[in-house]
Amino acid sequence: MKNKCKFVGIMFLCILIVCTLAVMAYEHTAGMKGAAGGASDASDSAKNTDEADDILTVVTSFYPMYIATLNIVDGVEGVRLENLSEPQTGCLHDFQLTPEDMKLLSTADVFVINGGGIESFMSDVAKAYPKLDVVEACEDVALLSEDDADSDHDHDHDADTESDSDHDHDHEADAESDSAHDHGDENAHAWMSVPRYRTMVQTIASRLAEKDAKHADEYYANAKAYDAKLAVLEEKINSLKSLTNGQNIIIFHEAYAYVADDFSMNACYLLDLDEERSVSAGEIKQVIGAIKDDGVSVILAEELYGKIMGYTVSRETDVHVIYIDPLNRGEYDKDSYLYGMEHNIELIKEAFTK
């Protein structure tokens, strides 16, 4: 019995030793795996950091610049494209930068802007990020002057015989019109001119190629392909000049001065409309007077803000009001400019062939 107990004790001790050794072996193996896993995590982290360093972050100021740049960077590896404003913002007349906007700009390698003063917040950007590489798309474009469309056109009609108080009111309204979209002395809406927009695309491509020489050939190839499509639009415009050359028109948006210029039309009167102003009775009389005095048969208006005024003057006259897309808002579709401008061209063609 004594020997049996001794044997059981020895067996228990052996089992205990084996279990202890097994636990030690398991912990050693797990430790090795953990070390290997930690090394792998560190390697992945370093890899992710390297990949982040290889990303070129391009931020655009608003919709027209986004669409132009989207065509240039399309398919280029390692490019992140962001737009500062919402796609439905439209022109950046009174756009205020938010903390989120400033945070986005802090990540940017390149900031593509229209230029011409339309981005009124640029002094704040320059102050916050003095080393940010800014591409001004309009830098090689001949901008129109605000005086190229006659917003102070004088006509001899009933409005001139109004009382002094009404006359003063009209001048105040005209001052409102002149200052509503004030970008300085230049008309910054150059993307509405197809040949100027083509130049802007080339400028953006050249500057991106300088910044990211590794992908320069891709930027230039994309710009060339996009330019070929834009050239077709310009050819269509030129083919219609036999109808439009020298025609007097009225425009209800400053951007349409560029449309008039492309078609060799004379914008004899500008009434710049937006959501911030109402039209006075005196202004309506002036527009009707301009239609009669200058033989205007077509008005270019924006559907969003010019619908009521367009209806008013078309009811009083035989003028044809067409609603042109200012191409400053829309979907993030790289062909949206092509579609929008094609539609504008067709509307103008129809207006002058009726």
Where does each model-flagged region fall?
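Extracytoplasmic metal-acquisition and chelation regions
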Residues: 2-354
